[in-house]
């Protein structure tokens, strides 16, 4: 039913990943001193991967400005190419952020920035990329059941969803080998099962001082406009684990 209403764009999405990997390979690294720049956090993955929970945890830091799901980096990259590289990509990106305080830490939760992870690591000084992922069958079935307002048409098909999951998993494995100091792997299943250990590990990687408040993201009163709004208003729990018990053989076969 969903597929008849929304044509999947899976081939275009996977082709884009490949092209941006080539662009990343050809991009000259930015060797600026990271100490002169505030931290830019990019939360990446696929829809329904636990990213909203992670964003809620991080934004409990009072120095963090939560940008939400904004496609600013891709817009900046297009402008960078159109300007024939007269301006630096980081300069264009920060101008679009409209941040007046240079000490402000930002979180950008445009999930498909996973395709740009290599370019981000090279272009944005002090960039931190958090890759959120979960059990693939849980993730695939969760996106299939969801009804997104716009985009994510690949979720109309279990097979296409599996293709996209495999694509982002493969490219992130590659980028993690190349930019291991820039990318943090966050397993949603572990996060909700052992929240204290996983959250402390994340905060330590970010180089922040510990605060017990990070264990209570449901107390964060920030506005959440995604489908995860209800979930993040509740204490961390494991209710969303185990969707794979009801999945189809089609997605399972594609991931083998």
Kindly give the residue locations of the regions a language model identified.
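Single conserved hydrophobic/aromatic residue that forms the stacking wall/gate
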Residues: 246-256
């Amino acid at each position: 039913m969903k597929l008849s209403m929304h044509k999947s764009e899976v081939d275009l999405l996977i082709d884009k990943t490949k092209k941006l990997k080539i662009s990343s390979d050809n991009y000259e690294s930015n060797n600026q001193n990271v100490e002169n720049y505030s931290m830019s956090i990019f939360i990446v993955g696929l829809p329904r991967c636990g990213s909203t929970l992670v964003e809620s945890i991080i934004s409990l830091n009072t120095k963090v400005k939560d940008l939400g799901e904004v496609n600013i980096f891709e817009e900046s990259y297009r402008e960078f190419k159109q300007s024939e590289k007269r301006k630096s990509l980081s300069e264009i990106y920060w101008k679009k952020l409209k941040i007046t305080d240079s000490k402000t830490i930002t979180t950008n939760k445009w999930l498909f920035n996973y395709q740009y992870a290599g370019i981000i690591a090279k272009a944005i000084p002090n960039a931190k990329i958090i890759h959120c992922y979960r059990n693939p069958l849980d993730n695939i079935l969760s996106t299939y059941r969801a009804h997104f307002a716009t985009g994510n048409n690949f979720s109309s098909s279990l097979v296409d969803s599996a293709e996209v999951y495999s694509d982002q998993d493969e490219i992130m494995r590659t980028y993690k080998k190349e930019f291991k100091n820039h990318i943090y792997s966050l397993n949603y299943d572990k996060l909700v099962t052992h929240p204290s250990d996983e959250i402390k590990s994340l905060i330590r990687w970010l180089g922040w001082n510990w605060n017990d408040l990070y264990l209570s993201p449901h107390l964060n009163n920030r506005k959440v406009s995604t489908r995860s709004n209800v979930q993040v208003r509740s204490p961390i729990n494991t209710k969303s684990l185990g969707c794979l018990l009801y999945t189809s053989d089609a997605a399972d076969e594609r991931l083998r």
